[in-house]
């Protein structure tokens, strides 16, 4: 019965052209939802010119994975319409179902062959289904945007337990887009694409978004000194590096990336992302606005620059995470 209801609510798709703005972040700032939205941008490393942008302005679903458990939460009525088919496909994994949420539990494969373990049904199949089996489509939709944590590997392999840290980002969290923004800087164009189970509501919403002006440019940041606090002091980090060099010499490992975390005050993460974009334009730049966190970064990043003339060293962050906690 649930799948019959789902099939009766066939989604509609629509597009709208909107005024172009060379600062895609300004359009995003004006049009995107205050939570559960994301901005992806690309720039040429050599010329530093912006190339294109893709942003999730509104999400229908939020998919969050902790270990072997995946929670799919509907953020809109359109998102609710996707839950029955998901429930039908993964009924053998379903452990909880409410009006706006469905929770699925998977298990770690114990097959002796590594390839078979990777091919076994896993939490990632939820994402694959939402991307590949959607009953709506447009040039950009369906679209899922989000991120994987390093610890997600532990859902495929048995690894030593890692102590909880200050970073509470889940194993993965993805948004299933309902309204997206696309900006082509080379052509000087921008447009919206969206889907919904109510055609009239969809078109009215796109018309409303298309009529909104872009957000005002932020004031130039004040060049004040900020204090960064490291989780490992300089002496401790040097000791870690010396120990790892010994491990390489002994043949225990052949490659390693020692790292430490720095904490700074970040009252405006979107402004900080814009500053990073200005100083380090990259092919892959991202700003993610979750329910209780913001995540941004650039890749490939200029991690370290050395000027031999004045012997100045500059460090650049590759990923920044802010939390309301």
Residue ranges and their predicted role:
Residues 3, 7-323:
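Extended alpha-helical targeting/anchoring segments
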């Amino acid at each position: 019965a649930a799948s019959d209801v789902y099939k009766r609510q066939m989604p509609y798709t629509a597009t709208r052209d909107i005024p172009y703005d060379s600062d895609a972040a300004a359009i995003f700032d004006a049009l995107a939802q205050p939570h559960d939205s994301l901005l992806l941008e690309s720039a040429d490393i050599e010329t530093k010119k912006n190339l294109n942008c893709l942003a999730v302005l509104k999400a229908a679903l939020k998919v969050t994975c902790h270990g072997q458990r995946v929670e799919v939460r509907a953020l809109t009525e359109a998102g609710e319409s996707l839950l029955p088919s998901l429930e039908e496909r993964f009924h053998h994994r379903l452990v909880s179902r409410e009006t706006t949420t469905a929770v699925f539990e998977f298990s770690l494969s114990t097959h002796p062959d590594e390839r078979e373990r990777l091919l076994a049904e896993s939490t990632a199949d939820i994402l694959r289904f939402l991307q590949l089996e959607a009953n709506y489509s447009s040039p950009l939709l369906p679209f899922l945007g989000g991120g994987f944590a390093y610890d997600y590997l532990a859902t495929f392999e048995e690894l030593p337990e890692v102590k909880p840290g200050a970073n509470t980002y889940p194993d993965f969290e993805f948004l299933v887009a309902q309204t997206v923004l696309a900006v082509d800087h080379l052509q000087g164009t921008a447009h919206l694409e969206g889907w919904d189970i109510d055609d009239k509501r969809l078109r009215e919403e796109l018309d409303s978004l298309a009529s909104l002006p872009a957000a005002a440019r932020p004031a130039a940041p004040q060049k004040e000194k900020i204090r960064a606090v490291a989780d490992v002091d300089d002496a401790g980090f040097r000791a870690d590096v010396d120990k790892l060099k010994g491990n390489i010499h002994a043949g225990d490992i052949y490659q390693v990336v020692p790292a430490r975390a720095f904490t700074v005050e970040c009252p405006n993460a979107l402004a900080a992302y814009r500053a990073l974009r200005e100083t380090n334009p990259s092919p892959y730049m991202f700003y993610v606005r979750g329910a209780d966190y913001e995540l941004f970064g650039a890749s490939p990043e200029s991690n370290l620059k050395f000027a031999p003339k004045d012997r100045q060293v500059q460090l650049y962050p590759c990923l920044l995470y802010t939390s309301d906690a």
